[in-house]
Curated annotation (Swiss-Prot):
It is a multi-pass membrane protein. It holds the Pfam family Ycf4. It comes from Oryza sativa subsp. indica. The chain crosses the membrane at residues 21-43, 63-85. It comes from the Eukaryota. One of its GO terms (cellular component) is chloroplast thylakoid membrane. Belongs to the Ycf4 family. Keywords: Chloroplast, Membrane, Photosynthesis, Plastid, Thylakoid, Transmembrane, Transmembrane helix. This is Photosystem I assembly protein Ycf4. The gene is ycf4.
Amino acid sequence: MNWRSEHIWIELLKGSRKRGNFFWACILFLGSLGFLAVGASSYLGKNIISVLPSQQILFFPQGVVMSFYGIAGLFISAYLWCTILWNVGSGYDRFDRKEGVVCIFRWGFPGIKRRVFLRFLMRDIQSIRIQVKEGLFPRRILYMEIRGQGAIPLTRTDEKFFTPREIEQKAAELAYFLRIPMEVF
């Protein structure tokens, strides 16, 4: 989602609260609970869940491994739920031609650097750059090249929905709005 006027361009970023993250966090949580229940059932010698007959599974080594996978899955699931709760990666990009300032804001993990706020003058922007990697896992990333700072990504590296035409159009619109050149690598 973005908002544009003659002098200001604001682009809101979704972050980690995506449908896919909710799906995988739920699947991982339920699957790891199943593994943990089977491991606990094999330790106790009776079925905790009637759907999962685990009396044939010996506690050592299968039950131990199932319990380990269950605990590991719960930790990974907790990590996913925390990133969703904290909305890591969300924020906005604001380009203000009137003031000549570009502001990039992102939410991170809790701590000292939870809020990532970058501010640049427009005259320090050298170009808008598109990095294209084709192949089995294609990537198209939009960067803003800043004098003395290097390249700053404007799109997430896991956004695979961009077709070459979409990323090129977005880069061209942004380069036109900022009145700077566009490069493709």
